[in-house]
Amino acid sequence: MIKLRLKRFGKKREASFRLVACNSTSRRDGRPLQELGFYNPRTKETRLDTEALRLRLSQGAQPTDAVRSLLEKGGLIEKTVRPAEVVGKAKQAEARKAGAKNVAKQAAEAKAEETPADNTEA
């Protein structure tokens, strides 16, 4: 399988990265199949070969998480909702529903407590 990943180069503590297409079993800094772009995290400079990237993505290349975020910022792929975000939103929705049910139960219990008290006094 072909992966789109970042290949590190530069001096110590001054890293820059090349965006490359390579086999998933190859080393991080091994020989790539194709160089597709450049990213410098210090200056936030990004250069992408959009035609080559679209071709590789259409062929089924899988980007790593870091590359995926660069491609999303570059507008080459749509932002995807990651499973953790989906689970978090689902749990939030369940908590809201459970909270609404608890509030309704408490209101019903409060009315039930008030009603028998009124009947015994009358």
Swiss-Prot record:
Q: Which domain of life is it from?
A: Bacteria
> Which GO terms of type biological process are on file?
translation
What are the coiled-coil residue ranges? none
Per UniProt, which keywords does this protein have?
Ribonucleoprotein, Ribosomal protein
Keyword Nucleotide-binding among record annotations: no
Where in this protein does the record put region Disordered? 87-122
Q: Single GO cellular component annotation?
A: cytoplasm
Q: Does Ribosomal protein appear among the keywords?
A: yes
InterPro entries per the UniProt record, alphabetical: Ribosomal_bS16 (IPR000307), Ribosomal_bS16_CS (IPR020592), Ribosomal_bS16_dom_sf (IPR023803)
User: A single Gene Ontology molecular function, please?
Assistant: structural constituent of ribosome
Q: Which family would the database say this protein is a member of?
A: Belongs to the bacterial ribosomal protein bS16 family.
Q: What is this protein called?
A: Small ribosomal subunit protein bS16
Annotated organism of origin: Prochlorococcus marinus (strain MIT 9303)
